[in-house]
C-alpha cells in the first residue's frame, strides 16, 4: 500500500523529478509518452493510429436529445456533451469541452486532476514520477502543461515493445477485485483488458486518504445491479440534481462491463478482434490496425472472420437493435424528466425529506440504469438484450417514483398534472435551468486563447529535455 505523501515529501519528490528531467533523462523509465518516437520502429501501427484523426466529426448529443440537459441538471454534462470521436482528439476534446470550465491558473476550475486519467500516456508517466498521491492531488488545470500527448502507444504497451500492459495502477486493483488479474490473463483476455483501462464505469473517491483517486465500482461485481448495490452501500453520489434534489449517479462509458454481458464477451471475442483487426500493409506485412473504429468499416477483416452472413444483413440487424434500444431510451427519459419536475414541485409544496427519500431512491436507481445503458456507446452491438433489460427496469423504477409522487402531491393539495416547460431544444432546456451559456462559452474561448498556448509552450520546453 502506498503511503500518503506529506507536504514535505511531495515537494521533495517534485524537486527530484525536476532535477532528473533537467539532467536530460527520460521522464519515466517505464513510459515514453511521445507517440511520434515510435513512428519509424512501428511504422504501420503508428500510421494507422494516426488515422484516428479522420474520425473528426463533433456531434452535439445534447442538441440531438435535449432531455439529457434536464436529466443532468446541476452537473457539468448539462453544459456540454459531444459524442466521442477518434483517439487523436482525446486531449483536444477534454480541453475544449465546457465541462472542464475556464480555469485561470493551476488551482482554478470545477474539475479534479483525475479528469485527465483516460486521455494520455502522460498520465502513467506522472503517476510513475509522483505516485498516485501526487498525480491525483489538485485541480484539472494543474495537469494542463503536463498532459499533452493524446491516447497512444504507452497507454497499452510496454516501453518500446508490442507487449501489452496495464499502465494505471487503479486498473490493476479493479481487475484483481473481480478475480481476473492482468498478470495471469491470456493474451486474448489482455486484448480487452487494456481497453478496460478507459472504456469502463468509474468514479472519483471521496474518502479523505484517497480523495480524487479513480476507482472502479467492481467490488461486488460488474453488472448494473451489483454496481448499484456497491454505490448505495458507500452512500456515494456524483452530484445532487438541481430540480429533484436526488443524490445522483453518473455512469461513464461502461463498454467493458456491457461487452462482458453480451454474446461476444461470453465467447471471448476481444475488443481487438472487432475494432483493431489484423491487416496487411502494401509491403505484404501483417500488423494490428490501430485505427480503432467501427468493425463494419473493415468487414472482411472483422465480422467476416466469424460470421457467414453478408455485411448488409448484419448492418440491418444492428440497426434494428439500435432502434429498439433508442425507443426504450426515450421512454425512460420521458418518465425521468417528468419525475424530476414533479419532485421539484413536491419540495415546493413542503414535502419533507422523510416523505421524499423513497421517491428519490427510485429516481436515483432509474436514472443510473438509463445512464449506464446509454453511456455504453456500442451497447446495441455488444449486449442489446442487456441494454433493453436495464432500460426496462429504468422505466419501471421511474414509474414507481411517479406513482409515489402523485400520491404525495395529492396529499399536498395538487391533483392536476405538473406542467413541464418547453425543453424541445438544448438552448430551451438550458434556459429552463437558468444556465448562462453565453457567459460560459465566452469564458471558454478566453481560456483557449490565453491558457492553451502557455500549456503547450511549457510542455514543449519540458519535452526538449528528454533524451
UniProtKB/Swiss-Prot annotation:
Chain residues that bind heme c 4: 271, 274-275, 382
Note accompanying the cofactor annotation: Binds 1 Ca(2+) ion per monomer.
Ligand binding (Ca(2+)): 201-202, 250, 252
Keyword field: Calcium, Electron transport, Heme, Iron, Metal-binding, Oxidoreductase, Periplasm, Signal, Transport
Annotated GO MF terms: calcium ion binding; heme binding; iron ion binding; nitrite reductase (cytochrome, ammonia-forming) activity
Database matches in Pfam families: Cytochrom_C552 (PF02335)
Cofactor(s) needed by this chain: Ca(2+); heme c
Positions with a binding annotation for heme c 5: 264, 303, 306-307
Record-level GO cellular component terms: outer membrane-bounded periplasmic space
Family note: Belongs to the cytochrome c-552 family.
The protein's name in its UniProt record: Cytochrome c-552
